[in-house]
Amino acid sequence: MRNWRWLLLVLAALLAWLQHRFWFGPGNSGEVRMLQVQIVQQHQENERLRQRNASLAAEVKNLKDGDAAIEERARSELGMIKPGEIFYRVVEDIPAPLPNDTSADHGVDLSQPRREKR
């Protein structure tokens, strides 16, 4: 009977040591959870970069194969035009405020009749 008590005591001590190592030792459960979160974040970043690489590869292929993409970039980014073309720039006017627009009257209440000073 006495041997069983010693065996139980040794097993309890072993269990306590294993639990301590599981919760507080190197590679503990908190660290494992943190690493799992980092893995998920890294997978998301990798997927984002794969999509970006595919987009850039398609753009490079388009620039190598097609003149339309080169022309579009030259027109939009560099402001280039073809020989013989006439460049027109359309500048839109700022719309005048409407009479009932209270945002432009600078605090003047238009709903009240105006009283003139004499």
From Swiss-Prot:
Periplasmic membrane side: 25-118
Annotated HAMAP family: FtsB (MF_00599)
Keywords, sorted A to Z: Cell cycle, Cell division, Cell inner membrane, Cell membrane, Coiled coil, Membrane, Transmembrane, Transmembrane helix
Primary localization: membrane
Bilayer disposition of the protein: Single-pass type II membrane protein
Subcellular localization, as worded in the UniProt entry: Cell inner membrane
Any coiled-coil regions, as ranges: 30-66
Taxonomic path: Bacteria, Pseudomonadati, Pseudomonadota, Gammaproteobacteria, Lysobacterales
Full protein name: Cell division protein FtsB
